[in-house]
Amino acid sequence: MYSIKMRSSNQDIHISGAETICEFDKIEQTVQRFYNKGFFHENGQPDFLNIKIQKIMEPIKQIKALQIIEDDKANLQHLTQKCGVTEQALNQGMTYIKNETVYTGAIILSAISGKRLDSFGHRGIRATHFSFEDINNKGDLNERVTDALAIASCINAHPYVKGELCVSDDLTYTTGYFASAKIGYHRLFDIKPVNTRYGGRIIFVDDRIDLNHYILFLESTPKQVVYETV
């Protein structure tokens, strides 16, 4: 199995990213797909694109995908409250998402105080080395949803994670999500105005979490997210 990652940017501003884990015979078509995504993206033409291929040398951890909850009227404040995220922490998370700073990874905040707990600056924390397998093989989820669900499932695979809020920085995509192990994966429609580049990923955690161990899991452990519907 091989890990394949793509990142593209323009003047150090993030344009697009993608990754997966696949068999050797799928590398060529995966690289072509990532190349097309990186160079032909609505966020603009990149001046830098990097594709990295690395053989997986350790066991791959299986993670059960979060359940997708279909609720067109999902309310972010109600969802976060159910998961133990305070209004103060949510407001601080939205401040990070709406400011002009471009973070290339997730920001980890205390679910109680909203204080930032990681020390990675603009880089943030990156959930990497993962793939997504739909064992139903129905093909009823598009690529954007499978990528988001895979990341959300990895991020929430820890007992001290209260939930994750994600808002895409793509210009015309205005749907975000809030996800947690407790209540599943909820899409949030019209969470931002169209034709805006702000966005981000916020992880709300219990202050007792072992950050070093959690970050090592997100960034280094190979993970396969398995999606199954009843």
UniProtKB/Swiss-Prot annotation:
Keywords: ATP-binding, Biotin biosynthesis, Ligase, Magnesium, Nucleotide-binding. One of its GO terms (biological process) is biotin biosynthetic process. The keyword ATP-binding applies. Pfam families: BioW. GO terms for molecular function: 6-carboxyhexanoate-CoA ligase activity; ATP binding; magnesium ion binding. The keyword ATP-binding applies. Its cofactor is Mg(2+). It is an enzyme of class 6 (ligase). Pathway: Metabolic intermediate metabolism; pimeloyl-CoA biosynthesis; pimeloyl-CoA from pimelate: step 1/1. It catalyses: heptanedioate + ATP + CoA = 6-carboxyhexanoyl-CoA + AMP + diphosphate. Its EC number is 6.2.1.14. HAMAP family: BioW. Homodimer. Catalyzes the transformation of pimelate into pimeloyl-CoA with concomitant hydrolysis of ATP to AMP. Belongs to the BioW family. This is 6-carboxyhexanoate--CoA ligase. It comes from Staphylococcus aureus (strain MRSA252).
